[in-house]
Amino acid sequence: NDIINEFQSIDKYLSKSKKFIMVGCGSFPLTLFYIREKYSKLNIIGIDNSPEAIINAKMLIKKLMFSNIRFDIIDGINYDYSDIDTVFIANLVMPKTKVLKRIAMTCKSGTIILLRVPVMYGALLSEDVNYMELQSFDLVDEVIPSKDTDDILYKLLVLEKK
């Protein structure tokens, strides 16, 4: 499973985190469910600018009886990331550059940003971003989640706030 491969590669960053947020969690936040299973003590937040997505995600966690995930209807360009240790930006989040600028303005030094960016056919669906233009982040790692290079839609960049 691509998500499992991806998170095994970034485990060292998540294991140090106390507060995690996913920007663009969507209606079925499978990434958050995996993180919740692996990191039960982690304070987890999912945000999305779609009220319908958040309503659906809240109904789903209620059915699953998950207690340590909170969801908020808010755009990633308006969130205050000052108390967040790890930020995960979903592949379909747009505009990614504005979200990254907001993170750079509000997060503390050392915050880890897990940024999914499109490759190959993924660029048809999602926006790429040049994080280097912002000069606020160092590239720590690059993770290609799929072992099958014909099936790659995105890669994960691990950034750290300077």
Roles of regions detected by a PLM:
Residues 94-106:
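A short, conserved alpha-helix within the catalytic core of class I
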Residues 50-52:
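Conserved SAM/SAH-binding beta-strand->alpha-helix loop
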Residues 27-40:
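Conserved SAM-binding loop of SAM-dependent methyltransferases across substrates and taxa
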Residues 43-48:
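Conserved SAM-binding motif I beta-strand of class I
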Residues 110-122:
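Conserved beta-strand signature within the Rossmann-like core of class I S-adenosyl-L-methionine
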Residues 57-58:
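Conserved SAM-binding loop
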Residues 16-28:
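Conserved class I S-adenosyl-L-methionine
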